[in-house]
Regions:
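Thiamine diphosphate
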Residues: 2-175
Length: 175
């Protein structure tokens, strides 16, 4: 049964994301800590079927995720949109060039719902830059269950053999 928009708002979206990653066979999550991601990372770390790898910079995280994926392990990358903006060269010359199907779960800062002055410029350019990099991406729809959206993004990455960035709101990932 498909849930209504109101029912979707009652579901704990971060738990649904975590359950979906496990159900889809993800075994590694590479992350750069962010204010929105902190508690989510704690829950990933507590999952026996998921290995959390913390990186210090987004381009480093991308390289680690691609390396783990090269080893045959289904991998998700968890970063902030500002970090993806800084990893353009690695995205084009590594992840896209060698067709790594990496699911990128990206906290989307600087939107009208996150109108903090220093995030706003990053929010305004995120999607145009992703388009310019030919980075496949989508924003989550808060009125639809998040699990199927994560699954659709992961499936696209696999089928197209490319990274896919799913842009997440605060309610999607804040525990």
């Amino acid at each position: 049964m498909v849930k209504s928009g109101a029912e979707c708002l009652d579901v704990h979206r971060p738990s649904e994301i975590l359950d979906t990653l496990k159900r889809l066979g993800f075994r590694a999550v590479v992350a750069v800590p962010d204010g929105w991601l902190g508690e989510f990372l704690v829950h990933i770390e507590q999952e026996p079927t998921l290995q959390l790898v913390r990186a210090t910079h987004e381009e480093e995280a991308l390289a680690i995720a691609c390396g783990i994926r090269l080893g045959g392990v289904r991998t998700a990358l968890l970063v902030q949109n500002a970090g993806v903006l800084s990893m353009g060269a690695g995205m084009v010359s590594l992840a896209q060039r060698y067709q790594f199907p990496v699911l990128m779960l990206v906290s989307y800062r600087g939107t009208p719902e996150d109108a903090i002055f220093y995030h706003i410029p990053k929010g305004r350019v995120t999607e145009p830059v992703f388009t310019g990099l030919a980075l496949a991406h989508a924003r989550t729809d808060r009125y639809r269950p998040i699990g199927p959206q994560v699954e659709q993004a992961a499936t696209y990455a696999e089928e197209a053999s490319c990274p896919f960035a799913l842009l997440l709101s605060r309610e999607d990932i804040q525990w």
